[in-house]
Amino acid sequence: MPAFKTLDDLTDIAGKRVLLRVDLNVPVSGGKVTDATRIERVAPTIKELSAKGAKVILLAHFGRPKGEPVADMSLSQIISAVEEVLDQAVAFGEDCVGEPAERAVAALNNGDILLLENTRFHKGEEKNDADFTAELAKNGDIYVNDAFSAAHRAHASTEGLAHILPAYAGRTMQAELEALEKGLGKPTHPVVAIVGGAKVSSKIDLLMNLVKKVDALVIGGGMANTFIAAQGIDVGKSLCEHDLAATAKQIMIEAETAGCTIVLPVDGVVAREFKANAANETVSVSAIPADAMMLDVGPKSVAVVNDWITKAATLVWNGPLGAFEIPPFDTATVSAAKHAAERSKAGKLVSVAGGGDTVSALNHAGVVDDFSYVSTAGGAFLEWMEGKELPGVAVLTRPA
């Protein structure tokens, strides 16, 4: 990955106006933030810039207002949550451009923090419109992007500003890029990837890219059924995309050509009902009853997965191995997650995980803090795993 500038390259910024792009798209219920994780992630960058005497101006989106103001998508409702995390007062600007923004910025003292209104209240944001980008840039001397989770979008505040102002990566962006470089960019081999989740259709590009980069690809979750069925095995009533049999076969051919071992379940936990503590049994994948569905991979399969984790120097994980939300079909995911966490804690494994369900699964297993890096980025993490260029990253790493 080409070099990118970080906060370490930002010296003597007292009094400078720093436009800091952050991800504050947090869940809100009844006017209260229910999960402040994304605020907590960007807090170190905000605090560092403030401590250095910069005038910190936060740019963020919230929801999908489609280019016009929507009252319940105003960032004003999260101000108190941001202040609580930072333990510092945060001013609010009633627009992100124009006179309200300019007035709010002009009132800042060194070290002050200002949150401007939702950038997506303007159509120019998602269009990456040059005039809108120039209006945003009026209020800054320096641009810092700390929103990796929005880096897959070429919007005005995530990509456009870096063409106008000196551009730097914030601490969250820096940590994410460094972790991803260790995960797939320049990893230590053997590299093992675990990919789970419900559908192959949503992860075709991902699987096609991974087989060319990893030594072993473990496939779990509902998507494993599609690969099993593609080999002519009856999977009963299991979730399965039968119309993607040819795609599954092609992925297996690509893997063989690239020297990547595809690891599929050899046994599974099956049930007739999709509910907690449903009556279940463990069977070979070749003996799934016609009226049953596989909801988790079985103990023999878990042993194989854990053996691959033991062999690995690097692990990239996206998607659970089974229906982890419903016990006892969380057993395989929890077992593999705990094994990977132990190897990581012992310094024997670099483990990088990401994607919404993955983070939930690792939280469920109680091991999020023990993985080398857990990305909360969702779509950007997936596109990175697919080998796609992320506009918000590319613009930071372009030659000056």
From Swiss-Prot:
A Pfam family this chain is assigned to: PGK
Subcellular localization(s) per the UniProt record: Cytoplasm
GO cellular component, one term: cytosol
Residues holding ATP: 203, 325, 355-358
InterPro entries from the UniProt entry: Phosphoglycerate_kinase (IPR001576), Phosphoglycerate_kinase_CS (IPR015911), Phosphoglycerate_kinase_N (IPR015824), Phosphoglycerate_kinase_sf (IPR036043)
PROSITE patterns associated with the record: PGLYCERATE_KINASE (PS00111)
Oligomer status and interactors: Monomer.
PANTHER family named among the record's database cross-references: PHOSPHOGLYCERATE KINASE, PHOSPHOGLYCERATE KINASE 1, CHLOROPLASTIC-RELATED
Protein name as catalogued: Phosphoglycerate kinase
Naturally occurring in which organism (per UniProt): Allorhizobium ampelinum (strain ATCC BAA-846 / DSM 112012 / S4)
